[in-house]
Amino acid sequence: MHDPVEYFQNNLVPMVVEQTSRGERAYDIFSRLLKERIVFVNGPVHSGMSHLIVAQLLHLEAENPSKEISMYINSPGGEVTAGMSIYDTMQYIKPKVSTLVCGMAASMGSVIAVGGEKGMRLALPNAEFLVHQPSGGARGTASDILISARSIEATRERLYQLYVKHTGQDYETVQRALDRDTWMTPEVALEWGHVDEIVTTRGADDAE
């Protein structure tokens, strides 16, 4: 069965036509917005999606390593390794990456959102946030299951440290929040240090 998000992006993406000195040029809407240094993290986080996001970030860095990148996030989360590849690339590249949550930043979507540049992590008024510990299924021998459990515990510890670093919360607070599903409104996310500002309209500087 097809992923409805991928189907939409592949088959129902609007086209934008621009007039240039060489005539008309057509772009799909996401390519046109990429020209404006806007990247979308939309839908479940998986390896297919993450490598496209990483490629866009690297392209924009090569194009201009000193100019900000804007990332719009609406994601229910997904694969830890795929999400961490996006997060790590955001930290690795030279341009500052601002994040704006429009819809949902859950699970690995939350990790990507909190990894934006400090002071440039935004949320719209009706955004939702979810933080929790990683989950995984293990099968096989008792030894295999034990190895898998240790790996998940190590991943959980990395996530604890990541949230401590980016939110300013202490380790125990983060540990309690991630112990179970913790949903946050934008106001709670702001208080928690997950975002830096709740925005309702675009600023004058952003509109230019």
UniProtKB/Swiss-Prot annotation:
<dbReference type="GO" id="GO:0004252">
    <property type="term" value="F:serine-type endopeptidase activity"/>
</dbReference>
<dbReference type="InterPro" id="IPR033135">
    <property type="entry name" value="ClpP_His_AS"/>
</dbReference>
<dbReference type="GO" id="GO:0009368">
    <property type="term" value="C:endopeptidase Clp complex"/>
</dbReference>
<dbReference type="GO" id="GO:0004176">
    <property type="term" value="F:ATP-dependent peptidase activity"/>
</dbReference>
<dbReference type="GO" id="GO:0006515">
    <property type="term" value="P:protein quality control for misfolded or incompletely synthesized proteins"/>
</dbReference>
<dbReference type="GO" id="GO:0051117">
    <property type="term" value="F:ATPase binding"/>
</dbReference>
<dbReference type="InterPro" id="IPR029045">
    <property type="entry name" value="ClpP/crotonase-like_dom_sf"/>
</dbReference>
<dbReference type="Pfam" id="PF00574">
    <property type="entry name" value="CLP_protease"/>
</dbReference>
<dbReference type="InterPro" id="IPR023562">
    <property type="entry name" value="ClpP/TepA"/>
</dbReference>
<comment type="subunit">
    <text>Fourteen ClpP subunits assemble into 2 heptameric rings which stack back to back to give a disk-like structure with a central cavity, resembling the structure of eukaryotic proteasomes.</text>
</comment>
<feature type="active site" description="Nucleophile">
    <location>
        <position position="107"/>
    </location>
</feature>
<dbReference type="GO" id="GO:0005737">
    <property type="term" value="C:cytoplasm"/>
</dbReference>
<comment type="function">
    <text>Cleaves peptides in various proteins in a process that requires ATP hydrolysis. Has a chymotrypsin-like activity. Plays a major role in the degradation of misfolded proteins.</text>
</comment>
<keyword id="KW-0378">Hydrolase</keyword>
<keyword id="KW-0645">Protease</keyword>
<keyword id="KW-0720">Serine protease</keyword>
<feature type="active site">
    <location>
        <position position="132"/>
    </location>
</feature>
<comment type="similarity">
    <text>Belongs to the peptidase S14 family.</text>
</comment>
<keyword id="KW-0963">Cytoplasm</keyword>
<dbReference type="InterPro" id="IPR001907">
    <property type="entry name" value="ClpP"/>
</dbReference>
<protein>
    <recommendedName>
        <fullName>ATP-dependent Clp protease proteolytic subunit</fullName>
        <ecNumber>3.4.21.92</ecNumber>
    </recommendedName>
</protein>
